[in-house]
């Protein structure tokens, strides 16, 4: 495969390098470095965890084998009775002594060594590879990884991926292979064949989920990204329901709800094949959500799925929300009986402001993180700081996640509560102190710097806000306004705003950065590969973003002459570019009328 390097720009990320054509032929988004770094961190933790689980299984199997051999030997010894012949008796006893001492050890050692050879390096499937950068980084940066299979149904992408595999040398060519095929067909034809399946599509992953949950090996890792955030956050609820089987709500917690909708959808697909998922990490970053789940097979454990799903009732007036479980369980003798959930958990009208409720879901209401995994991933990232290009960002996200309440779905927004009452907002530290002093738990959220997770009921939350307003009076509002209705009631709980030591998390107390700004302008989604650039893209993204996306205009890669050549042919790069004019304002129209 002959390649004219003058037509390409070399992009280096981590230990991998890829050749990107100066035309928009193959999709690449620099902003996804956060996604790729987080995936590598989780993959490293998965390989370590997988090895630990295998060692534990071997140890258990070895002990079991030893006990079986000892039992057989003891039974054999009892069956053989001693004879009157002293020589024969001594000879027989001596033989049995050797067997009793050495037999179990040898059998256990043999079983251990035999099982040890069964653990092979994990096979990874990147279902939608595009340039192959992610697959190359997996192969070059993750120790102990096996074969990496990169798929794409676009010939230009597969050609680019194969070119990049060769460009990265022998290590990549020996581990990474690229195929032109439909990812869904490939996954369906390889059931339980991959230890890791990575889905990172352009848009919704819904059409790949059914085949993905079948392709993951038992105990394997499924990594899935969804970038259709407008759909998942309630802009088109009917579209979200058709894709994911859940109805979204427009709340301040909509991005976390998007995570939980995606998890519920994956669980639904897995249940059809007597499988279930265990989330280890769920992240909302930049313009997408990303979940990491392990997939297991168990018909009995699958029955617990309704206990992990809930409907959400959200008041249209004050944004109070309540969760109702889809199912419940009752212990019955030595078994468990599964029953429908009891509801509704709310009346027709909100008890706080008198407005109606919107109902959404079902969503995943069980924990979306495994705190042991999160701490392991975070420690691994800190120990390999130089190997993560986006170290600061992923470390900040993981730090915030490690301090979240794992068993509290969704969160409150302090500014939203204050906006409902039209009052000044208390500081986060004061509000958290009031919640803790009321004997409830509270934490932040990695999704929103203003988000507050707590197990306190909404009655306590509004009582705290009523007490705050009493000390910080506001102007009278319309009696029909939700805030006026809430404030018309006397608080049943007197809030204590004295500062509590737990009002600040450990990261906050140490002043560790938790929410970082974007590193550069236009840090977000990019134009789909091969799409014609129109005036709409220019107006939305700007000339700098569009041209930078197409040309991969990195000044450090070229000299001054190349920079001048890149500035000239804007007409060739952007088709249908409009003449730049200042849009008329209302003052202009008034002056011409």
UniProtKB/Swiss-Prot annotation:
It catalyses: guanosine(26) in tRNA + 2 S-adenosyl-L-methionine = N(2)-dimethylguanosine(26) in tRNA + 2 S-adenosyl-L-homocysteine + 2 H(+). This is tRNA (guanine(26)-N(2))-dimethyltransferase 1. One of its GO terms (biological process) is tRNA processing. NCBIfam families: TRM1. Pfam families: TRM. It comes from Arabidopsis thaliana. Its EC number is 2.1.1.216. SUPFAM superfamilies: S-adenosyl-L-methionine-dependent methyltransferases. Residues 68-81, 88-118, 578-587 have a biased composition (Basic and acidic residues).
């Amino acid at each position: 495969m002959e390649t004219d390097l003058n037509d390409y720009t070399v992009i280096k990320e981590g230990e991998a390098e890829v050749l990107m054509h100066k035309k928009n032929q193959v999709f690449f988004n620099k902003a996804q470095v956060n996604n790729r770094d987080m995936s590598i961190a989780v993959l490293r933790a998965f390989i370590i965890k997988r090895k630990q689980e295998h060692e534990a299984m071997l140890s258990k199997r070895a002990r079991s084998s030893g006990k079986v051999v000892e039992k057989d030997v003891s039974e054999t010894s009892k069956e053989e009775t001693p004879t009157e012949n002293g020589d024969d008796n001594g000879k027989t006893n001596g033989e049995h002594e050797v067997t009793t001492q050495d037999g179990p050890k040898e059998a256990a050692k043999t079983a251990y060594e035999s099982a040890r050879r069964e653990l092979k390096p994990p096979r990874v499937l990147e279902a939608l590879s595009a340039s192959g950068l992610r697959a190359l980084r997996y192969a070059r940066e993750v120790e102990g990884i096996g074969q990496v299979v990169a798929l794409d149904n676009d010939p230009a992408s597969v050609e680019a991926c194969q070119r990049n595999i060769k460009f990265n040398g022998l290590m990549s060519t020996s581990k990474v292979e690229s195929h032109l095929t439909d990812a869904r067909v490939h996954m369906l034809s390889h059931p339980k064949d991959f230890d890791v399946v990575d889905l990172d599509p352009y848009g919704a992953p819904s059409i790949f989920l059914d085949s993905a949950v079948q392709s993951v090996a038992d105990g394997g890792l499924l990594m899935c990204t969804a970038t259709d955030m407008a759909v998942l956050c309630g802009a088109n609820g009917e579209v979200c329901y058709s894709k994911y089987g859940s109805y979204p709500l427009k709340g301040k917690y909509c991005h976390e709800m998007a995570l939980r909708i995606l998890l519920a959808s994956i669980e639904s697909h897995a249940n059809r094949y007597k499988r279930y998922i265990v989330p280890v990490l769920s992240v909302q970053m930049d313009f997408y959500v990303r979940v990491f789940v392990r997939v297991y097979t168990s018909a009995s454990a699958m029955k617990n799925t309704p206990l992990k799903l809930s409907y959400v009732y959200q008041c249209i007036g004050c944004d109070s929300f309540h969760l109702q479980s889809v199912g419940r369980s009752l212990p019955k003798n030595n078994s468990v009986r599964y029953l429908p959930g009891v509801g509704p958990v709310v009346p027709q009208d909100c008890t706080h402001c008198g407005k109606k409720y919107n109902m959404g879901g079902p969503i995943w209401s069980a924990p979306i993180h495994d705190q042991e995994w999160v701490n392991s991933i975070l420690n691994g990232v800190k120990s390999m700081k130089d190997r993560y290009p986006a170290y600061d960002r992923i470390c900040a996200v993981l730090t915030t996640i490690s301090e979240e309440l794992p068993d509290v779905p969704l969160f409150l927004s302090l500014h939203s509560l204050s906006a409902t009452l039209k009052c000044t907002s208390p500081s986060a530290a004061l509000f958290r102190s009031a919640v803790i002093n009321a004997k409830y738990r509270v934490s932040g959220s990695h999704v929103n710097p203003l988000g507050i997770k707590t197990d306190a009921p909404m009655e306590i939350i509004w009582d705290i806000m009523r007490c705050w307003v009493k000390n910080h009076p506001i102007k009278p509002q319309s009696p029909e306004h939700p805030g006026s209705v809430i404030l018309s009631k006397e608080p049943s709980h007197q809030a204590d705003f004295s500062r509590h030591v737990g009002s600040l998390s450990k990261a906050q107390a140490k002043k560790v950065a938790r929410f970082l700004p974007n590193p550069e302008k236009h840090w977000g989604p990019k134009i789909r590969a091969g799409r014609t650039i129109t005036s709409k893209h220019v107006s939305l993204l700007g000339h700098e973003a569009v041209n930078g996306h197409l040309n991969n205009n990195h000044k450090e890669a070229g000299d001054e002459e190349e920079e001048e050549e890149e500035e000239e042919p804007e007409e060739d790069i952007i088709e249908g570019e409009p003449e730049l004019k200042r849009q008329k304002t209302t003052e202009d129209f008034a002056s011409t009328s």
